[in-house]
Curated annotation (Swiss-Prot):
Pfam families per the UniProt record, alphabetical: Ribosomal_L16 (PF00252)
Name the record gives this protein: Large ribosomal subunit protein uL16c
Protein keywords: Chloroplast, Plastid, Ribonucleoprotein, Ribosomal protein
Hydrolase as UniProt keyword: no
Organism: Ranunculus macranthus (Large buttercup)
GO molecular function terms listed in the Swiss-Prot or TrEMBL record: rRNA binding; structural constituent of ribosome
NCBIfam families xref list: rplP_bact
Main location: plastid
Superkingdom per UniProt: Eukaryota
Family: Belongs to the universal ribosomal protein uL16 family.
Plastid found in the keyword field: yes
An example Gene Ontology CC term for this record: mitochondrial large ribosomal subunit
Record text on subunit structure and interactions: Part of the 50S ribosomal subunit.
């Protein structure tokens, strides 16, 4: 699972997912990519599941780039706990995805293989996505 080695602060505010992604919205490394169409929190488990699905389908062919990294801690309170007594402890890590963000890139394979591998990874994501081609 992906998570930061160390952070400046243990806990973060939840924040808002306003607007579109201005950074990380162009294909930089591969020839094909998976682009987000909705805002959401994507957990490190979902990122890893998508990466594994793509790797399995492509087998040894091609290269995969994961363009997102979960850097936001999400805290969870224990079940049946009364209100108060502070914020819960960090349980998992998420990445805040905005529309337009590139999630995965793929290169060194044919378009048919890339399209199928990326569609399998897209089914692991909690949001609507689209397959895009560089150029």
């Amino acid at each position: 699972m992906l998570s930061p080695k160390r952070t400046r602060f243990r806990k973060q505010h939840r924040g808002r997912m306003k607007g579109i992604s201005y950074r990380g919205n162009r294909i930089c490394f591969g020839g094909y990519a998976l682009q987000a169409l909705e805002p959401a929190w994507i957990t490190s488990r979902q990122i890893e599941a998508g990466r594994r699905a793509m790797t399995r389908y492509a087998r040894r062919g091609g290269k995969i780039w994961v363009r997102i990294f979960p850097d936001k801690p999400v805290t969870v309170r224990p079940a049946e706990t009364r209100m108060g007594s502070g914020k819960g402890s960090p349980e998992f890590w998420v990445f805040v995805v905005k529309p337009g963000r590139i999630l995965y890139e793929m290169g060194g394979v044919s378009e048919i293989v890339a399209r199928e591998a990326i569609s399998i990874a897209a089914s692991k994501m909690p949001i609507r996505t689209q397959f895009i081609i560089a150029g």
